[in-house]
Amino acid sequence: QKQIISNAKAMADEFQRQGVRVVSGGTDNHLMVIDISLFGGDSKKMQDELDKVGIYVNRSAIPFDKRPPYYPSGIRLGSPAITIRGLKEKESREIVRLIVSLIKNIKNKGIKNQIKKRVKEIVKKFPIYEDFQW
């Protein structure tokens, strides 16, 4: 449980370093919500694009959001799934950098392909089960 929170704190810190606002200013638990309003704010599209590269998040409303409830400006994500695989703070920060790269380059297919390739490398290095294929 300590590693789950350590990974979440590393992720929140890395989002802020990358210029993405964490809604609560950080996290004290396994979850965080980031504000993507500076990057177009369409969390439905962002969720779909992240799904395509193997990173799973959820849309989330944020305080004072000007966007409609089905297309809010927030993305909610957490650290339990990556921590269960054995990822630590270093890899958690890398996952954030991949997310931010996709957010900032949403229309660039080449970058999205690079991100998908890197995600596959990470999950292969940190499998759920020894013989699990992704």
Kindly give the residue locations of the regions a language model identified.
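Short alpha-helical basic/polar micro-motif
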Residues: 2, 48, 93
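Structural signature of PLP-dependent enzymes
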Residues: 1-9, 28, 41-43, 109
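Conserved PLP-binding catalytic core of the aspartate aminotransferase-like
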Residues: 21-75, 79-86
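Hard-cation-handling environments
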Residues: 12-18, 22
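PLP-dependent enzyme catalytic core of the Aspartate aminotransferase-like
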Residues: 6-10, 69-134
